[in-house]
Amino acid sequence: MKKFLLLLHEDVEKMSSLSPKEMESLLNAHMAWAGKLAESGHLISGDGLNENGVSISGKDCIIKDGPYLESKEMIGGYYLLQAADQETVVELAKECPCHLWGGTTEIRPIMEMEDYE
């Protein structure tokens, strides 16, 4: 099985405008979907990400608050999945709850040792 990182890109304004009930609904949808992924053997891990972070760049290690302060999008969470191929993950990702609130999923294959040869 190959590993894939599923990044959840979310609209900052849209997410901040959700009511507490909508946020609870979103969380419950993610919990249910994660359960389905676990049952099928595809889920390795996953979690939400706090928008308050830092970025460190360059050889001088310049530190800035928040990785994308000027962006309208943020990476709000991730799922680490395993599957036979990327096509399987694409089909799984189509059911990700973040799409219900206008989010985008990005699939990135995790490199294996043989990929470096």
Residue ranges and their predicted role:
Residues 1-117:
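Conserved, structured core segments of small domains
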